[in-house]
């Protein structure tokens, strides 16, 4: 809360201004992150649709997953994830395997080819972003590094 100069009290106006500023900054941050995400996705050049790449990255990161687990992780309906996995499987990026404990359950795992797609995609995104960051002046680079500390802290608060 903002305090009046020389006072231990805040005014409704101070709180409203602070709240409005927080909303403005949050909106700009959300838009900037979305724009950067979209641009990185365009430079990934993975040959996969965004939903296929997202599912493949989730499988590669979390290991073997059931279709239900993957659908929940991706926040999509099971029939949607079934189609995504079918395409990934047809392209050789994932394999379906019976669960070791319950043979009725099918698990999806990334193939070596699928893992290579994820690695290659990350490398392309990192290379593009590294080039953009390297073009910044020294002052902007330091401001970005400082801002990242705040952004990372925001992310940690959300994860709690």
What is each stretch, according to the model?
Residues 1-50:
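N-terminal leader segment of winged-helix/HTH proteins
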Residues 2-3, 86-146:
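Charged, amphipathic alpha-helical coiled-coil/dimerization segments
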Residues 17-21, 132-135, 155-160:
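Amphipathic alpha-helical linker/stalk segments
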Residues 35, 60-61, 72-73, 120, ...:
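Alpha-helical structural segments
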Residues 39-80, 91-93, 107:
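N-terminal helix-turn-helix DNA-binding core of bacterial DNA-binding proteins
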Residues 83:
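DNA-binding alpha-helical recognition surfaces that contact promoter or target DNA
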Residues 142-160:
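Exposed, interaction-prone assembly regions rather than primary DNA-binding/catalytic cores
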